[in-house]
Amino acid sequence: MRKIVINGGKPLKGEVAVSGAKNSVVALIPAIILADDIVTLDGVPAISDVDSLIDIMTLMGASVECDGDSLKIDPRGVKDIPMPYGKINSLRASYYFYSSLLGRFGRAVVGLPGGCDLGPRPIDLHLKAFKAMGATVSYEGEAMRLSTEGKPLKGAHIYMDTVSVGATINTMIAASKAQGRTVIENAAREPEIIDIATLLNNMGAHIRGAGTDMIIIEGVEKLHGTRHQVIPDRIEAGSYIALAAAVGEGIKVTNVLYEHLESFISKLEEMGVRMTIEEDSVFVEKQDKLKAVSIKTSPYPGFATDLQQPITPLLLTAVGRGKIRDTIYEKRVNHVAELARMGAKISVLGGQIIYEGPNELSGAPVKATDLRAGAALVTAGLMAKGQTVITNIEFILRGYSDIIQKLNRLGADIEIVEE
């Protein structure tokens, strides 16, 4: 078993670069299956989810070459083999293979999504869209079988009953090679959706409206190869900015797109965080007295649910009392008990998190229950006096590229220990 061991209380300063967006690349890689030639992605993060996707693509017959943060994928040898078990089950993003395999072969057998346990995240909206486009859906044990029964997918008018990033992306991918026009109403607006649409359009798709609540796709017969730069990871950027404010003595976070983080940065400014925002970076000064604030997550462009946990250790340094309410994922409170173990005045009451500060944290053995909870515990461990040992670190390595190396370069005393 691997653990992260942190000896906290060290002054952190310097520069940290944000990697490519995890939530983009986990959809970009499956979407490449639709191309009839080589696609190269630049800015690919070094995370375990990408390693799993590479293994899956190779198993299916794709040729994959890695060169630094570039990934060259030739999908021409891909076969529609059933994938009910194996690494596919560890990925939440496994559902993006539904749309890409349907679009290329008209059929798919893929294991049900895995990933972090954050409460109900149903795939009903995905299946509703596929059915509207002419696919049949059935369950085979722990796998999903989809088929067009030998017919091409047909364009459809699809209204998303709730805003869903995954369902919006999946529908967009499937519709790219469907016959006719597909309209997605009440579409999610996240930057990652624009990123996937950009790749598909560069491959020859006709998609407009990505980033708005109505997306229109005119299906095409063929998609070709291209080269694509993955957008910076706004969640990683926010995590490092919050970390810098909590424990830094002058940290510059680079490869940041401010427009993707406006609601997050606005909340930091409300707290009194001093920072300098430049074209593609944020410099965070050493902080003095911060003010407690309340946070309510909402779909983009609101405060991102994925940043609710990473900002929590920073909130614990503030003076006063505040609340956090996550309206997206009801079970995103598992970090609270772990932070309380470190001495934080924080609890869950009536479906929301209540905290009071300022707090002085002490090192303790803690467990990462999901990806973003793990990020919160890393920051808390860096803030705390003494040693913090984090278990279940595979969650953290799923989404934060080279996190140990990046933090060590800032002056942290942090390492992965094998047992």
UniProtKB/Swiss-Prot annotation:
Leading EC class: transferase
Reaction catalyzed: phosphoenolpyruvate + UDP-N-acetyl-alpha-D-glucosamine = UDP-N-acetyl-3-O-(1-carboxyvinyl)-alpha-D-glucosamine + phosphate
Tagged with keyword Repeat: no
Gene3D superfamilies assigned: Enolpyruvate transferase domain (3.65.10.10)
Entries under Pfam families matching the protein: EPSP_synthase
Modified residues (2-(S-cysteinyl)pyruvic acid O-phosphothioketal): C116
Catalytic machinery residues: C116
Residues at which phosphoenolpyruvate binds: K22, N23
A GO MF label: UDP-N-acetylglucosamine 1-carboxyvinyltransferase activity
Compartments it resides in: Cytoplasm
Recorded superkingdom: Bacteria
Record's keyword terms, sorted: Cell cycle, Cell division, Cell shape, Cell wall biogenesis/degradation, Cytoplasm, Peptidoglycan synthesis, Pyruvate, Transferase
Pathway(s) the chain acts in: Cell wall biogenesis; peptidoglycan biosynthesis
Family recorded in the similarity comment: Belongs to the EPSP synthase family. MurA subfamily.
UniProt-listed NCBIfam families: murA, PRK09369.1, PRK12830.1
Function: Cell wall formation. Adds enolpyruvyl to UDP-N-acetylglucosamine.
Database matches in PANTHER family: UDP-N-ACETYLGLUCOSAMINE 1-CARBOXYVINYLTRANSFERASE, UDP-N-ACETYLGLUCOSAMINE 1-CARBOXYVINYLTRANSFERASE 2
Cited HAMAP family: MurA
Protein name: UDP-N-acetylglucosamine 1-carboxyvinyltransferase 2
